[in-house]
Structures are given as C-alpha cells and as structure tokens.
UniProtKB/Swiss-Prot annotation:
Organism phylogeny: Bacteria, Pseudomonadati, Pseudomonadota, Gammaproteobacteria, Enterobacterales
Gene Ontology cellular component terms for the protein in this record: pilus
Location (main, coarse): other
Annotated localization: Fimbrium
MF terms (GO), sorted A to Z: identical protein binding
Family matches, as Pfam families: Fimbrial
Source species: Escherichia coli (strain K12)
GO biological process: cell adhesion; cell adhesion involved in single-species biofilm formation
Physiological role: Fimbriae (also called pili), polar filaments radiating from the surface of the bacterium to a length of 0.5-1.5 micrometers and numbering 100-300 per cell, enable bacteria to colonize the epithelium of specific host organs.
Gene3D superfamilies: Fimbrial-type adhesion domain
UniProt protein name: Type-1 fimbrial protein, A chain
C-alpha cells in the first residue's frame, strides 16, 4: 500500500513538472530597430562613421574670444570615403551647408539656441586641409583631394570664431555636407 501511494505521488509530481515544461512560450514586443543608409552611384561611399559625427570643441575662455576675428585652437575631424574607384573619379571635394551667423560672416556657422543660454558673438568655422575657412552655402567646395583606390580620408578642422566680444554659454552648431567627385 505504501509503495502504491509512493508511486502515485511520484507519477503525479512527474506529470506536473512535464506539464510546466510544456507550457506555451510567451512573446512580448521588444522595440524597433531602424536601418538607415543610402545606395549611391558614385566613385566612393561615405563611411558610416563620417555620416553623423560630433566634433568636441571643448571649453574656450571668453578672454580668448574677446574681439572680432579671434579664434580658438582648431580641432581636427575627418570625412572618410570607402570603396573608392579611381576609374570613376580621381578627385573629391566637400561642401558644407549651415546657417551663417550673419551676412558679413558667411564662413561662420551660427550657434543653436539653448534653453540654458547660448554664447553670443561667436560661431564655428570649418577649415579645409589648406586652412581656408569654407563658405557654408553648400555650393562652395573645399580644395580637391586626389583619390586612391580603396579608403580615403579628407581632413578638416573646426574652431570658434569671434564676431565681437564673446559672452559665455552653450556653443553648438550643425552643418550638413555633400561630396563632389571629379
């Protein structure tokens, strides 16, 4: 009798555990994955790391930007081109587009307004590899870079440029760019 009771208890326990193991899987929504890119018919493809980048200009004292024409130290950044084919084009140049600080400074990006307060009398300049400040109209291209087959890097620099005595605050600016192949 004890063996029969023990067998019933063991069989009951096994059937309960197998029922739990056979329980239906639970599926929940996890989120969204965005895939973003572009297929281009060009001599090169802009590297994904160059498409959307942030250049850290750091903190600069207002005393360094106390008068019109004063600049901060320049910070380098690159636009990398991949899978270049020199049979298609042998040179590349880049144009930047952004809002100029004013009509007299078409090569100085205006700062974005900030809830915390933006710096005034200062903007951002973009310099090509020759050190020339680029006009930010999207149509004035940098000096040309001779392409090699494969990967190419086009160097630029950015710096703050004072249009008067700078006041403190956030100093962020944005520009888009396009590449011209010849």
């Amino acid at each position: 009798m004890k063996i029969k009771t023990l067998a019933i208890v063991v069989l009951s326990a096994l059937s309960l555990s197998s029922t739990a193991a056979l329980a239906a899987a639970t599926t929940v929504n996890g989120g969204t994955v965005h895939f973003k890119g572009e297929v281009v018919n060009a001599a090169c493809a802009v590297d994904a790391g160059s498409v959307d980048q942030t250049v850290q200009l750091g903190q600069v004292r207002t005393a360094s930007l106390a008068q019109e024409g004063a600049t901060s130290s320049a910070v380098g950044f690159n636009i990398q081109l991949n899978d270049c084919d020199t049979n298609v084009a042998s040179k590349a140049a880049v144009a930047f587009l952004g809002t100029a600080i004013d009509a007299g400074h078409t090569n100085v990006l205006a700062l974005q307004s900030s809830a915390a307060g933006s710096a005034t009398n200062v903007g951002v300049q973009i310099l090509d590899r020759t050190g020339a400040a680029l006009t930010l109209d999207g149509a004035t291209f940098s000096s040309e870079t001779t392409l090699n087959n494969g990967t190419n890097t086009i160097p630029f620099q950015a710096r703050y440029f004072a249009t008067g005595a700078a006041t403190p605050g956030a100093a962020n600016a944005d520009a888009t760019f396009k590449v011209q192949y010849q």
